């Protein structure tokens, strides 16, 4: 069941709706992080596991495959990922996730990540694309134990090329994020957009991106701030430090530029946060 969602969101299901569940458990074996256990129901699954980095790190790049046809009202995705002590993983998707117009029912997504001591997770899915008249609820929670490290990136696109004034608007997009850190308050973040307020909430922009990283410090803050201020085509960008959590916000109408900047920030801070030089997932270039 989705934490923070009403029970009514799960009612009125039909045979056309599908529920997909994926559970992943990573462990450290002989100095290498491996996928020890996998359980899945429905069309979401692990497409591929790569080890493109040097032998010293052995950080797997794991691609999560979601339905290429996109999601419609009544569909549900539940993803649970656990990193056992000392393990590391980079998770991404081979393509964007598309949320289409609904029949009055919500599309529901739940992501739960548990990072045990001295682990590292990079959660870097490709863009989420929200089409007009969609109803979406997304709940994502990260639990970090002492010594855990994390980088989270997300890009939200409203329409395939962003909404046009006469193109339409969402019914509801409700996105909740919680990052639980071991020694500080962490973050509770919510973005709720509907047909009445989406222009104001996004300040007229069509693409929103965020990046979160921990543990961070003031030096990392300065580095990222300089990257944002020196980038053109990003109309609004900001970065702040909440205890040990770095928070980056970007708004633009240029999908390619905002993606390039987000990936550039990741590549610069990865050695600081994760302790490894950046190796871009191959799927980002296909």
Swiss-Prot record:
GO MF annotation list: nickel cation binding
GO cellular component, one term: cytoplasm
Keyword terms, alphabetized: Chaperone, Cytoplasm, Nickel insertion
Annotated localization: Cytoplasm
Subunit-structure text: UreD, UreF and UreG form a complex that acts as a GTP-hydrolysis-dependent molecular chaperone, activating the urease apoprotein by helping to assemble the nickel containing metallocenter of UreC. The UreE protein probably delivers the nickel.
Function: Required for maturation of urease via the functional incorporation of the urease nickel metallocenter.
Major localization class: cytoplasm
Pfam families on file: UreD
Matches recorded under InterPro entries: UreD (IPR002669)
Organism taxonomic ancestry: Bacteria, Pseudomonadati, Pseudomonadota, Gammaproteobacteria, Enterobacterales
Superkingdom field: Bacteria
Family stated for the protein in its record: Belongs to the UreD family.
Record protein name field: Urease accessory protein UreD
